[in-house]
Amino acid sequence: MRSRDTVTYSLVFLLLVSIFSGIYVPEKNLELDENNDMKIESISKNNNLIDIPAWKINDRWNYNGYLDMVDFIVDSGVNTDLQTLTGTLESTVTDIYVTTVDNSSSLVYKVESQGYYEANNINLDGQPGDLEVNMDTISIIRASDLATVSQEATIDINFCRDFLWWCVDISVGTLEVDQSYSPPLEGYDFPLSVGESWSQDYTATTTYDGSSDYVDIPEDTVSQRTANYEVVSQGFSGVSYASCATSYNISSTNADGEDTGYKWFCPAVRGDVKMETIESLGFTAVHSLSSYQATSRQKVISIDVEFPLSPIDMEISAWVNVSNNNGNPLANEQLQFRYEIEGDIQTITTASNGSAHVTFNTGTSADNSDSGDDLGSHGILAWINSANPHTGASTVTIDPNVYEIDLYVNQDGVSVERTRENLTLTLDENVGFNAIRDDAITFSIPVINRGLRVSPPTVLQIEGPDGTLSLIHISEPTRPY
């Protein structure tokens, strides 16, 4: 009896600890059949940069999910028909406050999540019954870049063993896992752009507590880790959720180059529409958005930055705008402006037009997500600190090599969609880059203006697989990055 319950606990324990791991990234290699027709239906006129969202207390995301354990169970040698646990996950913003993160004053979100997973009518080493897992999580998220500062999870595991006509409830154990990251783990690098990649070295400190009659609680650990990320494509995530037809696939590998998952960021829901975590031990966790409930914004805060892409150590302007939910400007609103990377915190008040002007120095500080393309991308925040706090956010990217107009095509950022009989699919290496006659192939080609000024109309020359040259006129101005 004891050994069988121990097996049950170990399977679920290893699975849920994997939720704290990273996400994976595939490489792209475009190969179209020479015999198939190809046509370009649309070309993006500028790169679709996605800036950081601002959250509010009571924003809520609900997910349906499953935990696939097939490969892990096969490798473990356990005699069981358990393959997946299915369940739900609900995440809610419950607080917004200022705290100290790595010796820096930082505005953070507190996000509380409740997860429930079950597998009914399973057999574990001859024991029939139902497996249930409840998990409560508290995550601290830095508001300026949505980096994860820490996570606290409490996991309750129960196995209801069938006995004649009854079910004997066995409490396998309760596990408490606290994990902190230094520097905070940047799973996003705003503004998001297809083809952009970044890496981060960080220290993960994990402490364990809890109780179990069957398994020893693990020892605390401190480990040095590396995560590598890339925005590999934009398009349909596979989840049919309103307003999320265009989402952004952020994938990553660990220090050994192993795939560890992906997530699809959807700007319309201010978060992820789909998440997958691949654990090297042999199981996968997948969650798909079922509903997003945004709490009412009585006040809307936006930040307009003079030069979103800026030279280092330069005085620039920003305009913080406050309006009601009907778009009418609000005067005499007191806010706190925060450029936390340089410790620049100012109190500002909106004028009669609902706007407050502020100047700040971009500084010379690098961020902790090394992209190789710039020195750093840093969040700019404005918030109303009240019983009902409101936040606004934007990003400034600093680069020592900035010019007035600097256009280039990011070939690694090209996304490909294929439409076949009214079915549109984003192509990648898993699906395969192929087409048949009458398929419509749409290429989204990012043209980025990394300069400070709006560019004049220009022409993009494209050479097809057969050597045919196409000239695409970009008549609309390409705005700075």
What positions do the PLM features span?
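Short, solvent-exposed loop/linker segments at the N-terminal edge
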Residues: 307-314, 417-418, 425, 432-439
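Single conserved hydrophobic/aromatic residue that forms the stacking wall/gate
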Residues: 472-481
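Beta-strand-rich interaction surfaces with strong enrichment in secreted/lumenal proteins
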Residues: 189, 345-349, 433, 471
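Acidic, serine/threonine-rich low-complexity disordered tracts
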Residues: 30-137, 153-306, 397-401
